[in-house]
Regions:
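Helix-rich interaction surfaces within compact, conserved domain-sized segments
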Residues: 103, 107-109
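N-terminal intrinsically disordered, cationic/polar leader segments
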Residues: 1-100, 115-146
Length: 146
């Protein structure tokens, strides 16, 4: 794994509506963007990024969470910087790895920040479905939920 370090440089969260307001058709979009790639040596590159979670309802913008940071990537740094400088492109395998690391680290941070701002978490919450069994369950027993 060529990712050597990962660090946050800026964490910003805003709620634009009152916490008591009810929203219709709330949609949460999250995005990771590489903003700059610079060469630190033959084998290392610095990758600056921005993660954004936008909260949109049908009638208003509800909130915004934005996280910026830096990744130290190890590999063919010259080739990565050359491709990025020429057209803002990374090789698909490198792009997948970098964006996966960004999302893996930023989404948990965004969940904590959303809780503090009284916004819904920027990930879907799993729904628990308890199957209905015919007949009456035994007294004092409850279904097991895994």
């Amino acid at each position: 794994m060529p990712i050597k370090t990962f660090e946050f440089s800026s964490v910003d969260g805003r709620r634009f509506v009152k916490p008591t307001d009810r929203w219709v058709n709330l949609r949460v979009d999250h995005n990771s963007t590489v903003t700059l790639i610079s060469e630190l040596g033959d084998r290392q590159a610095s990758v600056d990024f921005r993660f954004t979670a936008n909260y949109h309802a049908s009638e208003a913008v509800v909130g915004l969470i934005q996280i910026e940071g830096n990744i130290l990537w190890e590999g063919d740094a010259k080739g990565l910087v050359k491709g990025w400088s020429a057209g803002g492109q990374m090789p698909p395998d490198v792009a997948q790895e970098i964006h996966t690391v960004i999302m893996t680290n930023c989404i948990p941070e965004a969940v904590l920040l959303a809780r503090e701002l009284r916004l819904p978490p920027p990930i879907p919450i799993p729904q628990v479905n308890v199957p209905q069994q015919p007949g009456k369950p035994a007294k004092g027993r409850s279904p097991e939920i895994a």
